[in-house]
């Protein structure tokens, strides 16, 4: 049955989920297939986290972090994430930066400072946005909301492979522990906790290939009467 959700002139597909659930890869491929813009909201938080490390701002100092985020010069060009004009695409994928990003994301003031930046990505012909609160907070009027899940073991294996391919050292047991801690922190924080939107479609990717996951999202989009 087709959705009766009213269409915004610029449609948004949100793909939320926990760390290493595959949402970033799926979102990028869906966006490429549809010719839509892409928002990797996690990259914004990682850029803020990297800046906090560089400028020695403590992760529990919410006011200082919000002030830092307000003044950051962040750009995305040709798939590269730039901080103050320097490409830091690889640097922000380090585990230490990811852990710091999860730690600073608990602060409502930090999340508020990044809301406008995220919503500004909504441009014609459309947007695919991935993150943790895209469907619940940033784009509640999205035409399609997907919540990706996967077992923590599958996610740790994926994360280990990603890190090794990028030249980072990684221990699978440490990754399992980090993921469990991040899941607890993300799900229990007061500001925009990680949870599926009430109208989100759940997609467990534990036993799915990337291609199968992408095709399922596109199939749901086609069910809305949209060309995909």
Curated annotation (Swiss-Prot):
One cellular component GO annotation, for this chain's record? cytosol
* Keyword Iron-sulfur on entry: no
**UniProt EC number:** 2.7.4.25
Q: Which domain of life is it from?
A: Bacteria
What is the catalytic activity of this protein? CMP + ATP = CDP + ADP; dCMP + ATP = dCDP + ADP
The entry's localization annotation reads: Cytoplasm
Q: Where does ATP bind?
A: 17-25
| Gene3D superfamilies (alphabetical) | P-loop containing nucleotide triphosphate hydrolases
Q: Which GO terms describe its biological process?
A: nucleobase-containing small molecule interconversion; pyrimidine nucleotide metabolic process
Is Transcription regulation one of the keywords UniProt gives this record? no
Matching InterPro entries:
Cytidylate_kin (IPR003136), Cytidylate_kinase_dom (IPR011994), P-loop_NTPase (IPR027417)
Molecular function terms from GO: ATP binding; CMP kinase activity; dCMP kinase activity
* Family of this protein: Belongs to the cytidylate kinase family. Type 1 subfamily.
The protein here is known as Cytidylate kinase
Native source species: Burkholderia mallei (strain ATCC 23344)
């Amino acid at each position: 049955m087709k959705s009766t959700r009213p269409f915004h002139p610029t449609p948004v597909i949100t793909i939320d989920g926990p760390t290493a659930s595959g949402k970033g890869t799926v979102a990028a491929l869906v966006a490429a297939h549809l010719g839509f813009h892409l928002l990797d909201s996690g990259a914004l938080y990682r850029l803020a986290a990297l800046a906090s490390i560089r400028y020695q701002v403590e992760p529990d100092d919410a006011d200082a972090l919000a002030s830092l985020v307000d003044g950051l010069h962040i750009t995305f060009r040709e798939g590269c994430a730039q901080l103050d004009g320097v490409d830091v695409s690889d640097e922000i994928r380090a585990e230490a930066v990811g852990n710091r990003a999860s730690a600073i994301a608990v602060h409502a003031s930090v999340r508020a400072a990044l809301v406008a930046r995220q919503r500004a990505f909504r441009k014609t012909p459309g947007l695919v946005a991935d993150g943790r609160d895209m469907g619940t907070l940033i784009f509640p009027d999205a035409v399609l909301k997907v919540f990706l899940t996967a077992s923590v073991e599958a996610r740790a294996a994926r994360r280990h492979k990603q890190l090794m391919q990028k030249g980072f050292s990684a221990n699978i047991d440490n990754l399992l522990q980090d993921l469990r801690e991040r899941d607890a922190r993300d799900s229990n924080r007061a500001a925009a906790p990680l949870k599926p939107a009430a109208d989100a479609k759940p997609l467990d990717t534990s036993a799915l290939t990337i291609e199968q996951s992408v095709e399922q999202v596109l199939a749901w989009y086609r069910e809305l009467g949209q060309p995909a």
